[in-house]
């Protein structure tokens, strides 16, 4: 007998040990990410062919203490490699792990390779060649701290490669993980099994192969052990022949029914092709269908629903997933009473949206991603009971009630003012720390980063409740909800893209058309707290030369131009935002040489600017130390210097509208007086109703020449 290590994923060790025991292995011992055992050639051949859970099997040749590269080389070269494979065979070393002395896996692989070829040379034999592309032999090394395991791989390519799935649908599961999910889903092999989001069909195909008692490796063409010196081809041919006969007979004996649904017809075609290649196409019925509206198919009595719904890691995908899980949970309760369900997901928050209590739950990894599998018993209930349960449950009642109240008050005001964009919630309740903005028929939820003393799981659960409640209260479609996380900005982070959606939306603000982008940047292109400021600038701009500094997307410039400004000059450091400003102007028919755009550091531009303006709007950052700016800027410290440069450009009778977001900003009125300027605080006049709870969102000043 030889010593072996069956390699698997974390969380599957005990399940694999049970499987190996059923395959005739005695004393299978689970270890981290694997199972150790002893086996004869016949036993290991059967394990390789029949294991649904192992990713590979390794014949362990040595376990040793490895403090440095010399330990590694000496232990490797002491093995009689001639007994393992012929010098004509090509090999490769798969080296996993590092320690204090062996810090690079490639270096570790090289030392093992040296030990192997030196063993052959010492026996007067040719050096075997290395082949990374098509090796006959794979040497497996696992190093953790000072412990090393060295052996030869019995499999070749990973055992998850069953041979039936050359291509996959979205986010495919490995076949070994799919088999584990099926084994733990509560299905006994005879009940009907349904996957409402089947993708490329892996869960159903693995289950059908189990029901048919079909060896998962029956379609594989090549095995690592076939290149070993002790390979027994006649024994292997006999074992493989038995499995082939069993596969053909087993399919005909299956009574269980399998149903697969997906809303993507192209992915369904892939699933059907995979089932055909696996030899189980006659057992599975595939059809197009939406999990949110799925109904019980004919013949599905006391069955099991098993599924791996999407669980996007990008935050921006969450609202749609929350709506999907919520609707899916409702449909399970409405249509599948008396059945069982098993759902696999990386997100416990999404699973909570099912609103079902789990009977059992398991932890498994999907690659490096920790996941949960939860099993549910679905109670028999009447349609009226289900409908009442779903419609009467209010999500996050305090938050929902506040949101309803705000929508009633602010929505009425926005319609009267002819505004497409407005805020309906602004962290009104401390425990629900988000801002919610309406942009036409879409909603943006901005989550303020939770304090460090709030557990991450609690913050995630609360955000899930916010999204679900917002969808429930507003009736907005989930695909029209955008989620962002606001954190303290540094340097040029406000200019950096968050994604590549590149969808823009045209909105209306007091008769002015503006372009917003809800997806690609942290900000949308429109600061909603300044809507009244922009309207006022438009009212003041008739026949005047207008200057907009730190202009962002130029929305204030558009208001001034539409209001009848004689000329406009728009200055911003970002070329992206200047182009956006040009698009905003063109959208409103404001084109011509009288409208100038300058890409520049506004502070440097002011130092050298010439010309005179009747109306200047400036909304600088509170603080900036951007690499693209030569010096730092602090609005409290530097606002008098700023006004000194602005006064030089301000015509007699002209006005500066100066705004910033610094809380507790204090205008240096004495410094202004020395410049011959005076300031009037107009902050309250520029605060719109939707920001009335946050009176420090901005401060705004009207600066003019002193009389």
From Swiss-Prot:
It is an enzyme of class 2 (transferase). It catalyses: guanosine(2445) in 23S rRNA + S-adenosyl-L-methionine = N(2)-methylguanosine(2445) in 23S rRNA + S-adenosyl-L-homocysteine + H(+); guanosine(2069) in 23S rRNA + S-adenosyl-L-methionine = N(2)-methylguanosine(2069) in 23S rRNA + S-adenosyl-L-homocysteine + H(+). Its EC number is 2.1.1.173, 2.1.1.264. SUPFAM superfamilies: S-adenosyl-L-methionine-dependent methyltransferases. Residues 43-154 form the THUMP domain. NCBIfam families: PRK11783.1 (NF008748). Specifically methylates the guanine in position 2445 (m2G2445) and the guanine in position 2069 (m7G2069) of 23S rRNA. PANTHER family: RIBOSOMAL RNA LARGE SUBUNIT METHYLTRANSFERASE K/L, RIBOSOMAL RNA LARGE SUBUNIT METHYLTRANSFERASE K_L. This is Ribosomal RNA large subunit methyltransferase K/L. It comes from Vibrio campbellii (strain ATCC BAA-1116). The lineage of its organism: Bacteria, Pseudomonadati, Pseudomonadota, Gammaproteobacteria, Vibrionales. The gene is rlmL.
């Amino acid at each position: 007998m030889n010593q072996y290590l069956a390699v698997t994923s974390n969380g599957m060790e005990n399940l694999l040990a049970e499987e190996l025991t059923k395959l005739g292995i005695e004393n299978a011992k689970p270890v981290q990410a694997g199972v150790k055992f002893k086996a004869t050639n016949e036993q290991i051949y059967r394990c390789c062919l029949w294991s649904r859970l192992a990713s590979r099997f390794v014949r362990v040749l040595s376990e040793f203490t490895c403090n440095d590269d010399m330990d590694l080389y000496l232990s490797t070269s002491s093995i009689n490699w001639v007994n393992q494979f012929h010098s004509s065979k090509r090999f490769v070393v798969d080296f996993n792990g590092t320690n204090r002395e062996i810090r690079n896996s490639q270096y570790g692989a090289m030392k093992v390779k040296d030990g192997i070829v030196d063993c052959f040379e010492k026996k007067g034999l040719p050096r075997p060649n290395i082949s990374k592309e098509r090796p006959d032999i794979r040497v497996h090394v696992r190093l953790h701290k000072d412990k090393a395991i060295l052996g030869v791989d019995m499999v070749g390519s990973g055992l998850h490669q069953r041979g039936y799935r050359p291509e996959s649908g979205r986010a495919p599961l490995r076949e070994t993980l799919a088999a584990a999910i099926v084994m733990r889903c509560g299905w006994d092999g005879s009940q009907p099994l349904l996957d409402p989001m089947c993708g490329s069909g892996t869960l159903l195909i693995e289950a059908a192969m189990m029901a048919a008692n079909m060896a998962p490796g029956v379609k594989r063409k090549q095995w690592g052990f076939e290149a070993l010196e002790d390979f027994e081809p006649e024994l292997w041919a006999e074992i493989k022949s038995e499995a082939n006969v069993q596969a053909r007979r087993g399919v005909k004996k299956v009574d269980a029914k399998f149903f697969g649904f997906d809303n993507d017809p192209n992915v369904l075609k892939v699933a059907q092709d995979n089932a055909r290649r696996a030899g189980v196409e006659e057992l599975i019925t595939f059809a197009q269908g939406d999990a949110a509206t799925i109904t019980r198919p004919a013949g599905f009595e006391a069955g099991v629903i098993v599924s791996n719904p999407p669980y996007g890691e990008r935050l921006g995908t969450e609202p749609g997933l929350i709506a999907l899980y919520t609707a899916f949970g409702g449909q399970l309760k409405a249509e599948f009473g008396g059945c069982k369900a098993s759902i696999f997901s990386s997100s416990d928050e999404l699973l909570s949206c099912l609103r079902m209590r789990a009977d059992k739950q398991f932890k498994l990894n999907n690659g490096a991603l920790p996941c949960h599998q939860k099993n549910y018993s679905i109670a028999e209930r009447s349609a009226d009971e289900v409908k009442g349960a779903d419609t009467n449950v209010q999500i996050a009642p305090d938050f929902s009630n506040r949101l309803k109240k705000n929508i009633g008050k602010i929505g009425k005001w926005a319609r009267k003012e002819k505004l497409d964009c407005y805020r309906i919630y602004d962290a009104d309740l401390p425990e629900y720390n988000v801002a919610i903005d309406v942009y036409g028929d879409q909603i943006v939820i901005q989550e303020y980063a939770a304090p460090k003393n709030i557990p991450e799981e609690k913050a995630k659960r609360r955000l899930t409740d916010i999204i679900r409640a917002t969808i429930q209260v507003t009736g907005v479609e989930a695909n029209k909800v955008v989620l962002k996380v606001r954190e303290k900005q540094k340097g040029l982070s406000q200019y950096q893209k968050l994604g590549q959606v590149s969808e823009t939306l045209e909105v209306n603000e007091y008769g002015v058309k503006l372009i917003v982008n809800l997806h690609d940047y942290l900000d949308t292109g429109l600061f909603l707290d300044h809507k009244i400021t922009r309207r006022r600038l438009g009212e003041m701009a008739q026949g005047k030369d207008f200057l907009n500094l730190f202009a962002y997307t130029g929305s204030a410039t558009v208001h001034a131009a539409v209001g009848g400004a004689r000329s406009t000059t728009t200055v911003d450091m970002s070329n992206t935002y200047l182009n956006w400003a040009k698009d905003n102007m063109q959208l409103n028919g404001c084109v011509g040489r009288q409208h100038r755009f300058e890409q520049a550091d506004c502070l440097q531009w002011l130092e050298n600017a010439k010309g005179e303006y009747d109306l200047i709007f400036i909304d600088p950052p509170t603080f900036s130390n951007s690499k693209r700016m030569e010096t730092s800027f602090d609005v409290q410290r530097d606002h008098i210097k700023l006004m000194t440069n602005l006064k030089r450009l301000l015509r007699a009778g002209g006005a500066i509208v100066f705004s910033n977001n610094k809380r507790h900003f204090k205008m240096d009125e004495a410094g202004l007086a020395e410049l011959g300027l005076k300031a009037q605080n107009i902050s309250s006049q520029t605060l719109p109703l939707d920001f009335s709870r946050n009176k420090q969102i901005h401060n705004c000043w009207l600066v003019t020449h002193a009389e």
